[in-house]
Each structure stands twice: as structure tokens, then as C-alpha cells.
Amino acid sequence: MADTKEMKKILFAPFLDNNPIALQVLGVCSALAVTTKLETAFVMTLAVMFVTAFSNLFVSLIRNHIPNSVRIIVQMAIIASLVIVVDQVLKAFVYDISKQLSVFVGLIITNCIVMGRAEAYAMKSAPLPSFIDGVGNGLGYGFVLITVAFFRELLGSGKLFGVEVLPLVSDGGWYQPNGLMLLAPSAFFLIGFMIWAIRIIRPAQVEAKE
């Protein structure tokens, strides 16, 4: 029972209590770039979750055999290999989305969330908790991405997953798309609002005044 509770805590903590974007402010670049549509945000979430979970698992499995002097290189090699697999799978099965994600799939290699969890958690923990931690941080990252993408696509184009939800003026409806929501600065504002909302729910995350 204790192990189950601990696993649940590891899995769900990255949503609100220790969100990699909202609290740690990591992975923000991709949050700006891939959140104009829900489908790209969803696929990016799956990609990051896969890479984070399995890089954590593999790093944890060999952590006692990695010389300290080359541990970062080994972690990078594992992460890069997983990213290549993800990139090839996306190109094979969802080529159009892969083109929209462009270089940001490859840049998962340098994503601070992935590297941070491998170094800070997987190097010190057993394989199963490390894997769960990777899944949790991928989901926490995706929680922000998908929330931001929901509002950007809905308000920016009147659509969700490419399907018209709000009747557009151009089609005789009442909604005029807000082009600002499709620009990168809108993601900054939305992430800021999310951080504000999370810190209302979790006051302990508010930094102490100097």
C-alpha cells in the first residue's frame, strides 16, 4: 500500500505540486512553438513523455555502471537514441504533424525536463520509480501544453483538433478569430495565467518576499 501511494505521488506531483513548466520554468520554448493546435501539442506530449520515461528507465538500470566523469554523455546518448526513434515513428505514421513539429522533436534532446529528470532522479532511484517519474513529468508538461493549445486554437481559429467549434464570420457565423492567439506571445500570457491560477491553488509555491 505504501509503495502504491508513493508511486501515485511520483506520478501526479508534476501536475500541480512540481510542474516542470509552471513551477520549474523548463521546456518553455516548445510550449510557445507547438501549441497553436491541439493535435501538435498532444503529439509533442506523447513524444516527450515517451523519451522522459524510457530515458529515466534506461539511465536508472545502468546508473551503477556509469563512470561519474561521463554520466552526462551517456545520458545524452540514451536520450538522443530515443528521440531518433520518436522522430522516425512520427515521420512514418503522422508525417503531416511531424512536419508541423519541425525541429522541435529533435530539440527534445536538449529539453531541460528530460535531462533534469535523468540527472536529478533516475541516477539516484530504482528503475520503476524512475519510469513513473518520467511518465509523470511528461504528463505534467503535457497538461500545460494541451491547456495552452486548447485556448490558442479555440480562440485563434474557432476550431479544436481542426474541427470548427465556433461558427466563423467568414462562414456566416458570429465568431471572429483572434489572430493574436496564434502568435507566440499569447502562449506566454496563457502560461502566466496558468502559473497564477496554480499558485492560488497551491500558495506554498509563491516565492517569499526578499
From Swiss-Prot:
TM segment ranges: 10-30, 42-62, 72-92, 103-123, 131-151, 178-198
One GO process term, biological-process aspect: sodium ion transport
GO molecular function: oxidoreductase activity, acting on NAD(P)H, quinone or similar compound as acceptor
Enzyme class name: translocase
InterPro entries per the UniProt record, alphabetical: NqrD, NqrDE/RnfAE
Signal peptide limits: none
Bilayer topology: Multi-pass membrane protein
Domain of life the protein comes from: Bacteria
Compartment(s): Cell inner membrane
GO CC annotation: plasma membrane
Function statement: NQR complex catalyzes the reduction of ubiquinone-1 to ubiquinol by two successive reactions, coupled with the transport of Na(+) ions from the cytoplasm to the periplasm. NqrA to NqrE are probably involved in the second step, the conversion of ubisemiquinone to ubiquinol.
Subunit structure: Composed of six subunits; NqrA, NqrB, NqrC, NqrD, NqrE and NqrF.
Name of the protein: Na(+)-translocating NADH-quinone reductase subunit D
Origin organism lineage: Bacteria, Pseudomonadati, Pseudomonadota, Gammaproteobacteria, Vibrionales
